[in-house]
UniProtKB/Swiss-Prot annotation:
Keyword match Lipoprotein: no
GO process annotations (BP): L-histidine biosynthetic process
EC number in record: 3.6.1.31
InterPro entries associated with the record: HisE, PRib-ATP_PPHydrolase-like
UniProt pathway annotation: Amino-acid biosynthesis; L-histidine biosynthesis; L-histidine from 5-phospho-alpha-D-ribose 1-diphosphate: step 2/9
Record carries keyword rRNA-binding: no
Protein name: Phosphoribosyl-ATP pyrophosphatase
Organism in which the protein naturally occurs: Mesorhizobium japonicum (strain LMG 29417 / CECT 9101 / MAFF 303099)
Gene designation per UniProt: hisE
Enzyme class: hydrolase
Length: 107
C-alpha cells in the first residue's frame, strides 16, 4: 500500500470543498469562509501544543492530524497550493535557519 501524503489530503480537500455534501466538514468550512477556517486552525494549533507539553503522545498524533487538515483547508481557501509551501521550504534548506530568518524582509 502506498503511503498517504499531504498531496493526497490536499486533493481530497479540493474535491470536497464545493461538493455541497451536507455531511462534509470540508464543504461546511469552505462555505463558512476563511475566518472560520483560520479560527479552527488556531484552535488546533493550541490543542497540538498542549498535547505536546503534556507528553500526550496519542493526543499529539490526533491533534497534529487535525492541525494539518485545517492548515490545508486554509491554504485552499487562500488559493495557495501546497506546492508553493514546499518550494519555499526547499529554498530554505541550503541556509541555516538563523541566516534564512535574517534574510526575510522586515515589516
Amino acid at each position: 500500500m502506498a503511503e498517504f501524503s499531504f498531496s493526497d489530503l490536499e486533493a481530497i480537500i479540493r474535491d470536497r470543498a464545493h461538493s455541497g455534501d451536507p455531511d462534509s466538514w470540508t464543504a461546511k468550512l469552505f462555505a463558512r469562509g476563511i475566518d472560520k477556517a483560520a479560527q479552527k486552525l488556531g484552535e488546533e494549533a493550541v490543542e497540538t501544543a498542549i498535547a505536546a507539553v503534556k507528553g500526550d503522545r496519542q493526543g499529539l498524533v490526533s491533534e497534529s492530524a487535525d492541525l494539518i487538515y485545517h492548515w490545508l483547508v486554509v491554504l485552499g481557501l487562500s488559493g495557495v497550493p501546497l506546492s508553493d509551501v514546499l518550494k519555499e521550504l526547499e529554498s530554505r534548506t541550503g541556509r541555516s535557519g538563523i541566516a534564512e530568518k535574517a534574510s526575510r524582509p522586515k515589516g
